[in-house]
Structure formats: C-alpha cells, structure tokens
UniProtKB/Swiss-Prot annotation:
This is Oxygen-dependent choline dehydrogenase. Involved in the biosynthesis of the osmoprotectant glycine betaine. Catalyzes the oxidation of choline to betaine aldehyde and betaine aldehyde to glycine betaine at the same rate. The active site is at 470 (proton acceptor). GO terms for molecular function: betaine-aldehyde dehydrogenase (NAD+) activity; choline dehydrogenase activity; flavin adenine dinucleotide binding.
Length: 569
C-alpha cells in the first residue's frame, strides 16, 4: 500500500468530494480520500423521490442522536450524517439553497475575513449548472446540476402556495438563489437529468478516473498524526487492521460538523476539560473545537386537502412501483423530484434586513420516513426559524473512535428563539388561510386550531419539532483575537501546521437555508486556497433588500389577517 500522498482528505462527503476533484485536477498532486462508508450505487440514493430511505439506514448514515434536550422537554432528536460516497449529499433532501447574501456578510463580520457574499458568489457559480442557464448569479458549466424538478407542472398546489404568500402581502421571487431571496417562488434541487446530483456523482466520478487519485472506503479515521504542532498524516482502521498514511503537504478534515470535531478531539486538539474527561492526551488546546454548534428545526403544518390531487394517493406499493419503473426507463416523472417545488423565505418581524423563516411546500401530508400522516388527501409546509441564537456542543466521551460523541444543540434556549417560533406558527397559519388556498384547504390537522396562545404554541413546538438535519458551525472560522475560533480565514487550524477543516463545521453562523449548497461553495473556495490560486471575486453584484425593512415586516397588509381566520376554518 502506498503510504505517502501530497494531500489526505478525511470524508468523501459534500466537501470532501469537491476537494478530491479539485486537488487532483492538475495531475500534479497525489491525493488520498478516506471514507467510512461504501458505494452510493443504489436506486434509493440515485432516485430523488426515495429520499426518506437512505438517511434512516445504518448502511448509508451515522445514526447519531442528541442528548435529552432541555428546551424540548427532554426529547432526543435524530441526527443522521452521511456515511457513504457523497456523504450527506447522498442522503439529504436535495434542496438547493445558497443562503442570503447577508449570511455571508455576517460571516465576515464575525471574523471570517474575505468570506463576504461578493467573495463567495463566484464559487456558487463555479459549482453549478442551472437548467435556466448562466447569469451573473447562476452557474452554467459547473459539476452540480440544479433544477426545479418538474417545474411545478404536476400539481396546482405549488402555485397556490405562492399565490397565498402574495395574498398575505409578501413579495414573489423568481429566483431565491439569485437577486432576491425574500418572497415566495419555485424551489430548486440538486437533481441532474432526473438523478440525484450528489458530490459523488458531480465531482468524485471525475477524480476516480485519474491515476494520481486514490479512494479508500470502509475506513475509520482514528486520529491525525502530529509531529509537535504539525499534522503529518492519519491513523485509521480498515478491515480490522490499524494503518497509517502520511501527507507531504496537508491533511484536510471534511468529516462534517460532527465528524471533524470528533477527529480533532480524538487527536488531542480541543478544549482541555473535554479531552481530560475523555482520557485523551492534550496535544493542542483549542477551546472552540465542538462549540458554537447550530442547527435548524422545523415543524410540519398539515391540512386535509379538499381535492383528491395530492401525493397521498401515490404512497401505496403499486403506485411506488409505477413511479420507480417510469424513472428507471426515462429518468422522468414523480421519481425525478424531491417534491419540494415551491417555497418561501420571509422576515418574522420588522428590523430584520434579511429573511429568518423558511418554508418548504409539499403536496402531501406525510412523515419524514415517507409514511402517510393520515388517511385521505393532504398537504403540508415544513417551516422553521433559520437564524437561531441557541448554541450547542459536540464532545467525544472516550478515546475510542467507535464511541458516538455527545451531541447537545441546546435547542430553543433563548427568549428570541421562543418568540421566533411563536411568530412562525402564527404567520404560517395566516398564509395558509389566504383566499388562494380556499379551493384546496380542508381542516387544519396540525398544529390544530386550539394551538393559539403563547403557552400552547410553545408546548406544541417542544413536542413536535424535528431537526432539519443541518448541524454546523462547530469548528468555526474567526479572527486571531477570538478565543473560540478554531480556524483562520484560510480554514487552517490555529496553531497547527498542515491541517485544515473544510465542511459545514467551519461556518461562523448558520445561513438562512439548507446547507449543501454553501458547503460545496466553501469547498470550491478552499480548494483554490489550498492550491495557492488567485481567489475569484464578484464586483458589487446587486442584492434585493426589502425597502423599509427597518419599519415593516412585509410589503402589504394581508387580504385576510389572523383575527378573521378562525371563522374561515
């Protein structure tokens, strides 16, 4: 076995596959990619509609759980992370949301110098081929294919949801990944010609054709090998055998917001109290490793549908078989979409410059495991506040790499987070009770019309909220005078030579949207940094900000306000 490489990357996920491709592209560098999981060649991964299967299986995902979360009355939430080629991009819901421009300007304000929106935009474009074609926001020749599924053509509910948002006084946006995030419009997904556009399909497939690239699967990384304050390699286990490999240039951890923390701490890099408690020798004290953990939560707002047009009629075995057969033969139809084809981003209150609430609309009422929520037809909106104040932590509990770490998100632990949820429930109910939904909207199944007071909303949210599976920010970038910053603006671990982290853990703050798109962007930009390339930069590309955002929460008053809604339902 070859033991020496130029670059060693741990984790073939959303970021690791990008790095593997870009670092091996010139043919000048020997690149090794280590992955704990195995092949992604399964219809349950490749067919978009099957998205609920891989994230719930041991084969394709680390089945982590949180501790009993105090803010959720002691509930433990599921926290699956990809353990397969493509990582979480092979098990996620394929929703393509870059985030708001203000999110990246916020990163820079938090100390991640140079990570403002104008610096990030070229790398979003570089990664993408958008079916609508290239413009100053969207990419036209990148590895990741993005689209709007079936362009909302297969169900009238998608457009009805957008019209309801307009009825409620919110703007319409044609492209939330472009000039204007705020508003109601079509939703985009990482689906390329009907197939999941994971980073394995988009990037790793290219790297695997190169003689200077090596992929090793079924590998458990034990620790980063250090010589003093320099990273020189990785110790790992494969088929029960402990092995070592060495990096001439750099080691890069792309193991994700749980895995990268675990690897650093197992290597003796992290908070002294955590390492001492776990019985790990402290090699380098960095208090921020595993801190600042953030996530998105969501609830499902569900209604009966008065017309028999929803996907609830497609959940039987015969229907699934027909959908699967059409997809196998044509890569088209209901198999070629994640079914989230319309969406919205709104501000919950005046004084916010950019949105903090996200909606995914689904023309079905089901649970995340893919089973029906009730008999008959229904629809639902996945909704939650996307800019939480709550911060959590990841901590290893022992020196054994096979022991699951302690994950505590500290969900809904601030007064503002609680208020955001109250606003979220009330605003969502108001939107879904606008005239545009009258022809379709039946009884409100959940939360239920009795959930109206602050106390009732708070209790219902605690019992019904689920993770949107967006753990992030646990190895944040920051300035040298920030004692909790794990990385500098070049993704380098502070105080350790030859070691970087490149994945969603490096975000200083969680963006307003799903995490796959910004994670790919981060990896594209980090690849240029690692290779010493000149960083690309946009030139003041304009971004829509709501006029009078300081004084108004939305553009116009709703056609129906909340006080009149109880009489409609």
């Amino acid at each position: 076995m070859q033991q020496h490489y130029d670059y060693i990357i741990v984790g073939a996920g959303s970021a690791g596959c990008v790095l593997a491709d870009r670092l091996s592209e010139s043919g000048q560098h020997q690149v090794l990619l280590l992955e704990a999981g195995g092949s992604d060649k399964s219809i349950f991964i490749q067919m978009p509609t099957a998205l609920s299967y891989p994230m719930n299986t041991e084969k394709y995902a680390w089945q982590f759980e949180t501790v009993a979360e105090e803010g959720l009355d002691g509930r433990q939430l599921h926290c699956p992370r990809g353990k397969v080629l493509g990582g979480s991009s092979s098990i996620n819901g394929m929703v393509y949301v870059r985030g708001h421009a203000c999110d990246f300007d916020e990163w820079e304000a938090e100390g991640a110098k140079g990570w403002n929106y104008q610096a990030c935009l070229p790398y979003f474009r570089k990664a993408e081929t958008w079916t609508g074609g290239a413009d100053e926001y969207r990419g036209g020749s990148g590895p990741v294919g993005t689209c709007n599924g079936n362009d909302m053509k297969l169900n009238p509910l998608y457009q009805a949801f957008i019209e309801a948002g307009k009825d409620a006084g919110y703007p319409e946006t044609q492209d939330y990944n472009g000039y204007q995030q705020e508003g109601f419009g079509p939703m985009h997904m990482t689906v390329d010609k009907g197939v999941r556009a994971s980073t394995s399909n988009a990037y790793l497939s290219r790297a695997k054709k190169r003689s200077n690239f090596t992929l090793m699967k079924g590998v458990t990384a034990h620790r980063i090998l250090l010589e003093g304050k320099k990273a020189v390699g990785i110790e790992f286990e494969q088929s029960g055998e402990i092995k070592q490999c060495f990096a001439n240039k750099e080691v890069v951890s792309s193991a994700g917001s749980i895995g990268s923390v675990q690897l650093l701490q197992l290597s003796g890099i992290g908070p002294k109290t955590v390492l001492d408690k776990a019985g790990i020798e402290v090699k380098h004290t960095l208090e921020g490793v595993g801190k600042n953990l953030q996530d998105h939560l969501e609830v499902y707002f569900q209604y009966h549908c008065k017309q028999p047009i929803t996907l609830n009629s497609k959940l039987g075995l015969i229907s699934k078989g027909l959908i699967g057969t059409e997809w196998i033969l044509t890569r088209k139809g209901l198999g070629a979409t994640n079914h989230f084809e319309s969406c919205a981003f709104i501000r919950s209150r005046e004084g916010l410059k950019s949105p903090n609430i996200q909606f995914h609309f689904l023309p079905a009422a089901m649970r995340y495991d893919g089973r029906a929520a009730f008999d008959g037809h229904g629809f639902q909106v996945h909704v939650g506040p996307n800019k939480p104040e709550s911060r959590g932590s990841v901590e290893v509990v022992s020196a054994n790499p096979n022991d699951k770490p302690k994950i505590e998100f500290n969900y809904i632990s601030t007064e503002q987070d609680k208020q955001d949820w109250r606003d979220c429930i009330r605003l969502t109910r108001e939107i879904l009770n606008q005239p545009a939904m009258d022809a379709f909207r039946g009884e409100e199944i959940q939360p239920g019309l009795n959930i109206t007071s602050d106390e009732a909303i708070g209790e219902w949210v605690k019992q019904n909220v689920e993770s949107a599976y967006h753990p992030s920010c646990s190895c944040k970038m920051g300035s040298n005078d920030d004692p909790m910053a794990v990385l500098n603006e070049a993704c380098q671990v502070r105080g350790i030579e030859g070691l970087r982290v490149v994945d969603s853990s490096i975000f200083p703050t969680i963006p307003n949207g799903n995490l796959n798109a910004p994670t790919i962007m981060v990896a594209e930009r980090a690849a240029d940094m690692i290779l010493g390339n000149t960083l690309e930069q946009s030139n003041n590309t304009p971004v829509w900000i709501a006029p009078n955002w300081q004084e108004t929460q939305r553009m116009r008053p709703p056609k129906r306000d909340l006080s009149s809604i109880s009489s409609i339902a």
